[in-house]
Amino acid sequence: MLIRKPADHLPSEITSESVYFNRRQFMAGAAGLLLSAETLAGLAAKKSPLSQLAANDKPNSLKDITSYNNFYEFGTDKSDPAENAHTLRARPWSVLVDGEVAKPRRFSIEELLKFPLEERVYRLRCVEGWSMVIPWVGFPLASLIKQMNPTSRAKYVAFETLQRPSEMPGQRQAVLDWPYREGLRIDEVMHPLAILAVGLYGNALPNQNGAPIRLVVPWKYGFKSIKSIVRIRLQETMPATSWNMANAHEYGFYSNVNPDVDHPRWSQASERRIGEFFKRKTLPFNGYAEQVAGLYRGMDLRKNF
């Protein structure tokens, strides 16, 4: 059976246990592949440094998590990814890790699934002002990066999404400069909260949620957590990122969740948790300030937004 990773979260923060286990057999998008029983049984049981959620947090349904998405490669409406992502072929799949490393390497998704997996129940805060709580399955990004033996020149890490317009119909439109690109500083990448997710609710990722592998950085706005990754490149200079290239005035490189720094067109002081009627206050760093604020000590977070 699935060994759920204990964390400082209340039972009300995720979908109820009965729903969770009844849903474990849903098929993961077009690939239709479940994480193996051996993989599930191997989920780590040790604690991780996760912050507590507020007592009034309410669960998100599996339906919400898999039907309310931003994934412009499949369309710009929230329902488009669930409707259109069946066209994505998530197998075979590989991720190239190159740049400032001892030896570049291409990993198959099967090789990546051999990393010790664990469940991480994280908040997700979208820059648009809505949020969810999601139980991801994945492994620390740092474990992959350490294996690559970065050089001393590796100051940043660039990520790239698959570009395949035949399977990603949104890429046929010039909504963004495809492929989708994101980036982090190397110390952000090495932080234990940053993970590469390969599943949710104990199953392989549905296509609309970023199959077969995506980044999850819970203290940043959701667009930083790039989906359907095909390349991870370590480099000396700050990488170009898609939304920053599209509108640098509205989307900064760091994009840490910050209720004191508004988007030019709306406030970031509060958020709407999907499934709730009333808004709630947004927490600095999405509630993970105790763990990550030290990464930005001495920085002007208004200037470096």
Swiss-Prot record:
Gene Ontology annotations of biological process type: protein repair
UniProtKB keywords: Metal-binding, Molybdenum, Oxidoreductase, Periplasm, Signal
Molecular function GO terms recorded: metal ion binding; molybdopterin cofactor binding; oxidoreductase activity, acting on a sulfur group of donors, quinone or similar compound as acceptor
EC number(s) given by UniProt: 1.8.5.-
Primary residence: periplasm
Reactions listed under catalytic activity: L-methionyl-[protein] + a quinone + H2O = L-methionyl-(S)-S-oxide-[protein] + a quinol; L-methionyl-[protein] + a quinone + H2O = L-methionyl-(R)-S-oxide-[protein] + a quinol
InterPro entries in the cross-refs: MsrP, OxRdtase_Mopterin-bd_dom, OxRdtase_Mopterin-bd_sf
Signal sequence annotation: 1-54
Cofactor dependency: Mo-molybdopterin
Cofactor details (free text): Binds 1 Mo-molybdopterin (Mo-MPT) cofactor per subunit.
List of residues binding Mo-molybdopterin: N69, Y72, E73, C126, T161, N209, R214, S225, I226, K227
Subunit: Heterodimer of a catalytic subunit (MsrP) and a heme-binding subunit (MsrQ).
Family assignment from sequence similarity: Belongs to the MsrP family.
NCBIfam families: PRK05363.1 (NF003767)
Protein name: Protein-methionine-sulfoxide reductase catalytic subunit MsrP
Organism: Chromobacterium violaceum (strain ATCC 12472 / DSM 30191 / JCM 1249 / CCUG 213 / NBRC 12614 / NCIMB 9131 / NCTC 9757 / MK)
